[in-house]
Amino acid sequence: IKPGTKDVFKGLAIYGEGIQNLMNDAPTDIGIQNDFGNTVSPVKGVALPIASFMAYLDHSWNESFSSSVGYSLVQITNSDGQAADAYHKGQYASANLLYYPLPNLMAGAEVIWISRDNYKDGFHSSATKIQVSVRYNFSHTLGKH
């Protein structure tokens, strides 16, 4: 979606069961559901519900500078038989400033924040990092002068 001449919005929302293989962060599609009243099959495999969304805004400041800022979330509804340290929720946010001094050269800096919560063991971890990148695009076709 282009909300303005210098902006591009990218968004996605998804919900499903057993689709974790389609996600980068979510590791398990099927969880153990306890059914202790059933002596023949006291546990069964169930497709785990997952909800996820992401939203990013790309902005062109001028011919030499651009930025992206955004956020994403993935959250699993865990089954009661999963381990306490099973993946439950992950979050990711980033913002950058890119500089294009020449047509084939880009340099930029980005701040990234990540977070993970486990199912039941109370584990929570987050980290913030700064990343610096330089990219030069080049090409040459052999046999052409």
Give the residues covered by each predicted segment:
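Detector for outer-membrane/organellar transmembrane beta-barrel domains
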Residues: 1-81, 87
